[in-house]
Curated annotation (Swiss-Prot):
<comment type="subunit">
    <text>Binds with high affinity to both apo-bacillibactin and iron-bacillibactin.</text>
</comment>
<keyword id="KW-0963">Cytoplasm</keyword>
<dbReference type="GO" id="GO:0043565">
    <property type="term" value="F:sequence-specific DNA binding"/>
</dbReference>
<dbReference type="Pfam" id="PF01497">
    <property type="entry name" value="Peripla_BP_2"/>
</dbReference>
<dbReference type="InterPro" id="IPR018060">
    <property type="entry name" value="HTH_AraC"/>
</dbReference>
<dbReference type="InterPro" id="IPR009057">
    <property type="entry name" value="Homeodomain-like_sf"/>
</dbReference>
<dbReference type="InterPro" id="IPR020449">
    <property type="entry name" value="Tscrpt_reg_AraC-type_HTH"/>
</dbReference>
<comment type="function">
    <text>In iron-limited conditions, activates expression of the feuABCybbA operon, which encodes the bacillibactin uptake system. Acts by binding directly to a conserved direct repeat element upstream of the feuA promoter. Activity is increased in the presence of bacillibactin.</text>
</comment>
<dbReference type="InterPro" id="IPR018062">
    <property type="entry name" value="HTH_AraC-typ_CS"/>
</dbReference>
<keyword id="KW-0805">Transcription regulation</keyword>
<dbReference type="Pfam" id="PF12833">
    <property type="entry name" value="HTH_18"/>
</dbReference>
<keyword id="KW-0804">Transcription</keyword>
<dbReference type="GO" id="GO:0005737">
    <property type="term" value="C:cytoplasm"/>
</dbReference>
<dbReference type="GO" id="GO:0003700">
    <property type="term" value="F:DNA-binding transcription factor activity"/>
</dbReference>
<keyword id="KW-0238">DNA-binding</keyword>
<dbReference type="InterPro" id="IPR002491">
    <property type="entry name" value="ABC_transptr_periplasmic_BD"/>
</dbReference>
<feature type="DNA-binding region" description="H-T-H motif">
    <location>
        <begin position="182"/>
        <end position="201"/>
    </location>
</feature>
Length: 529
């Protein structure tokens, strides 16, 4: 007898439109089946972002992140089913948790031919919200039936265009230095050139030519940052025989010439840990190495991932620090920028890799920024940037005069507990530079959980809420919103609860603080008392 597998639903939710909860990537602690039924936009799973395909099943594995970016109309219909897999192996009497699941094989499956799927998913979500044991039992049974239908349909699904597209994408990425033609790629995919072009655009959001050029420019940037190659050599290694044509294409896509780009990247700077990259970017120095992730460092990932050749792990911020130190040691940077608050072991190992400039954690972000600028001989650029920042805060205060009299409370919700979240950036930028009023005193502890009753006692006019993007927290918050205790909070009654992402509010840096000012204006400029 073969191994037996059972799938236990952890959460089922049917979304009729995009929610702020899913705009920022969230962490999956189990397999997540994402059924996209209607609407346009993009879906990100880990570091891969692609246009949403109607009637398509996406699968996010455990310990990975996912999120939606809606199109301009912002409308989407989707169902999210979180599942735990259990397996009973031959000869065993019990089911044990299984992280390696056949569910992964269902990713990007076309589900249009599964009968009454939208209705079934809506009914599943409704069953999940019922509290009776019979409803929960039926829900588990219906989930097994749905998964059976998915696997059955996948066996008879003979169309595998997406796999062919992925195969050709990989070929482009690994053969960027060679001549690549549409005829060659379509032949490799086993479909006509017209069908291939249309399918490629559908699945990637880019034309074949755009993808090839982007791949070559990204490779060129990394060669410029990692080596002392001549421009002609870089052009040849990225598929361009004419270095002058390459220069024109490079400037068109990046806004600067290859010579200017290489001049800025001559010094190989590694930004180690949180916040340090935020002092380099305003000085127009893109680091050679830095921690990047689409969830934990989303801004830097979106804007600079193609420019940074050595990408350290930012998974759960610095959870993989030992792996990062090894990567840095292999990359051989010229200098490393780090906070001095890292562990003695990290400091010792960093010191053996390269020269390290430590920023003193007890000093202010302005001191950190000016110290970084002094090290890079960019003092005048730093002074100009700070003057511009001060002008931005002055303008923001004028724009937000109508809410200056309100009292703000920053909270973070993790699992089923609230905590005060008046961190250093919030205190110095929001309450300091922007001059808003706090609903709490500066000496209130932030590690201690607080009750809804205590939150009510603060009598805050506005609540700024950091919601941890993981299943238990999201489920609790959705239930909490239906309770009388929550609805009676004055900020809730006045519709002044603002959901915030941790980025940039937990980044103590020049770039992070500029983005806090900009985000505050965006959030509050339309709020009229």
């Amino acid at each position: 007898m073969q191994n037996a597998v059972i799938y236990q639903p952890v959460q089922i939710e049917y979304l009729k439109k995009t929610s702020d909860l899913f705009s920022e990537q969230q962490l999956a602690d189990s397999f997540v089946l994402i059924f996209h039924l209607k609407g346009n936009g993009y879906i990100s799973i880990g570091t891969n972002t692609n246009p949403l395909q109607k009637k398509t099943l996406y699968v996010c594995p455990p310990n990975e992140t996912f999120g939606f970016t809606p199109a301009a109309d912002g409308h989407i219909d989707a169902c999210i089913i979180r599942l735990l897999s259990y397996i009973k192996e031959t000869g065993q009497d019990i089911f044990t948790p299984c992280t390696e699941s056949e569910l992964a094989k269902l990713k990007l499956m076309n589900v249009s031919h599964i009968e009454n799927l939208a209705v079934r998913l809506q009914e599943l979500a409704a069953l999940w919200n019922e509290s009776s044991q019979l409803s929960q039992l039926k829900c588990v049974i219906e989930v097994q039936s749905l998964i059976y239908d998915l696997f059955t349909a996948s066996l008879s699904d003979q169309t595998d265009t997406h796999s062919a597209i992925e195969k050709t994408k990989h070929y482009i990425e690994t053969h960027a230095d060679t001549k690549i033609t549409l005829a060659q790629l379509s032949q490799m995919a086993g479909i006509s050139a017209k069908h291939y072009s249309e399918s490629f655009k559908k699945w990637t959001g880019q034309s074949v030519t755009e993808f090839i050029t982007k791949t070559r420019i990204t490779k060129a940037k990394r060669l410029m940052a990692k080596s002392n190659c001549k421009l002609k050599e870089i052009a040849h290694q990225t598929g361009y025989q004419d270095e002058f044509y390459f220069s024109r294409i490079f400037k068109k896509y990046t806004g600067c010439s290859p010579t200017s780009y290489m001049k800025k990247r001559r010094k190989k700077i590694a930004a180690y840990g949180r916040g340090t990259m935020g002092h380099l970017i305003p000085l127009h120095h893109i680091p050679f190495a830095a921690a990047l992730h689409p969830k934990w460092t989303s801004y830097y990932y979106q804007h600079y991932s193609t420019d940074i050749p050595v990408q350290l792990s930012a998974y759960r911020f610095n959870e993989k620090w030992e792996e990062n130190l090894y990567t840095l040691s292999q990359a051989e940077p010229d200098v490393i920028v780090s906070m001095d608050s890292i562990s003695p072991e990290e400091q010792d190992r960093l010191n053996r890799i390269a020269e390290v400039m430590y920023l003193p954690s007890e000093e202010s972000w302005r001191t950190h920024f000016l110290q970084t600028a002094s090290f890079l001989k960019e003092e005048s650029e730093a002074e100009k940037w700070l003057a511009d920042y001060d002008q931005q805060t002055t303008a923001a205060k004028k724009t937000l005069q109508h809410v200056q009299g309100l009292r703000f409370l920053f909270l973070r919700l993790h699992k089923q507990n609230f905590y005060l979240a008046h961190n250093r950036s919030v205190r110095e930028v929001f309450f300091g530079d922007l001059g808003f009023s706090s609903a709490t005193t500066a000496d209130t502890p932030s590690e201690q959980a607080i009750s809804l009753e205590n939150i009510a006692n603060y009598q805050a006019d506005c609540m700024m809420l950091f919601l941890f993007k993981e299943p238990e927290t999201i489920a609790y918050y959705q239930q909490l919103q239906q309770t009388e205790a929550w609805q009676n909070l004055s900020a809730v009654r006045d519709n002044r609860v603002y959901l915030l992402s941790l980025d940039p509010w937990n980044e103590y840096s020049a770039c992070g603080h500029e983005r806090i000012v900009q985000q505050t204006v965006s959030l509050l400029s339309g709020d009229c008392p």
